[in-house]
Amino acid sequence: MSMFLDTAKVSVQAGRGGDGMVAFRREKYVPNGGPWGGDGGKGGSVIFKVDEGLRTLMDFRYNRKFKAKSGEKGMTKGMHGRGSEDLIISVPQGTTVRDAETGKVLTDLVEHGQEFVVAKGGRGGRGNIRFATPRNPAPEIAENGEPGEERQLELELKILADVGLVGFPSVGKSTLLSVVSSAKPKIGAYHFTTIVPNLGMVRTKSGESFAMADLPGLIKGASQGVGLGTQFLRHIERTRVILHVIDMSATEGRDPYEDYVAINKELEAYNLRLMERPQIIVANKMDMPGAKEQLQRFKEQLAVQYDDFDELPMIFPISSLAHQGLDSLLEATAELLAKTDDFLLYDEADFAEDEAYYGFASEEKAFEISRADDAAWVLSGEKLERLFVMTNLERDESIMKFARQLRGMGVDEALRERGAKDGDIVRIGKFEFEFVD
């Protein structure tokens, strides 16, 4: 089984905030002591952090559920509960995180040590010391902790490489990478020897260095899923320069120029922006019989494609096996990299507006009313449900406070307008109460 994994689906759940406490001072010589219940601690958030030592999402193959710890409950003497530590999850450089439900990109993690909160922990509930007023100096009110955010996420790894090698299978991409770097890709005399991307660091004789990625071979129709399809082409999206490797020996009966055109069509079909990247044509296997004649014919065909105003791509004849022409290729690649800017995969507008967000947008609909099959009125809505779960239903004063909040939101009036009558059942989740007109 391959140990390389570049996509994963995970679920994350932040910790719930600790419940606030209802407590009163019980001290000698202090009659009728006031409220003394502290707030609950915050729940732990779930945070993704980039680890440059990771190269794959393999850790997420079997471990797909992550849950941070909840905060501790508030205590007497006005002491707050302990907040929970955040859950830090390491991901490799180049990990894109999407919300699985909306498909929206949350973040693109590319820098070592970069962090992003994917699920924010709930705040602790307030203790009764927070609700004291001149009219009610000893309130028996405390809030439950706020639930932590839950999310289903899709992770996609697009490896960070400056240069990407593309071409048909068996044109010598892996051999080239193994010769110019310390990478040890699998090499064989058959198609699709490379079934996962390989990454190597290249250093030129002039001292320049860059990362080079060898991708599994493409064939005609890859954009429609033929062969290995384009499942690994995502890894070329971050590259700044493409080395298009072509077998000039034509030993398998293929035409080098037709190969060149076919691969570019597949790149364009996958992502139009790939064609914005500068290409260097690598004419490989020049030590084979007939390669020089094929190269001359290739240049003539290429010249026909470009008019007088277009600049022909650079062509470097090499032999990876014989170590011929490699130095000039690498120097030219380094020079091209030096004058080529990074290609941003995502604009700021592509990202979700916020990290895990718990406020209520002003335009958010506060609640919705529907009718159940048993004729009960059902209240729903994010804001209303959050207020409900933070209400301590074991305390009458907390329930009365929640009733006032519903009235302030306009729930009572809305129920009347919908035809609710005295004694009708109103339901929030599994909790039921009677409507009083």
Swiss-Prot record:
- The OCT domain covers which part of the protein? 359-437
Gene designation:
obg
Cellular compartments per GO CC = cytoplasm
Per the UniProt entry, what species is this protein from, by scientific name?
Streptococcus equi subsp. zooepidemicus (strain H70)
Q: Which PROSITE patterns match?
A: G_OBG (PS51710), GTP1_OBG (PS00905), OBG (PS51883), OCT (PS51881)
The protein's enzyme class? hydrolase
Task: Cite the OBG-type G domain residue spans from the record.
Answer: 161-338
**GO process annotations (BP):** ribosome biogenesis
Family affiliation: Belongs to the TRAFAC class OBG-HflX-like GTPase superfamily. OBG GTPase family.
| Keywords carried by this UniProt record | Cytoplasm, GTP-binding, Hydrolase, Magnesium, Metal-binding, Nucleotide-binding
Q: Where does Mg(2+) bind?
A: S174, T194
**Which cofactors does this gene product need?**
Mg(2+)
* Stored HAMAP family: GTPase_Obg (MF_01454)
- Can you state the subunit structure given in the record? Monomer.
Query: Would you say which domain of life the source belongs to?
Result: Bacteria
Query: Where is this protein localized, as stated in its record?
Result: Cytoplasm
Q: What sequence ranges are listed for the domain Obg? A: 2-160
Statement: the UniProt record of this protein carries the keyword Electron transport = no
- Recorded protein name is GTPase Obg
Q: What is its EC number?
A: 3.6.5.-
Q: Which Gene3D superfamilies does UniProt cross-reference here?
A: GTP-binding protein OBG, C-terminal domain (3.30.300.350), GTP1/OBG domain (2.70.210.12), P-loop containing nucleotide triphosphate hydrolases (3.40.50.300)
Tell me where the transmembrane regions lie: none
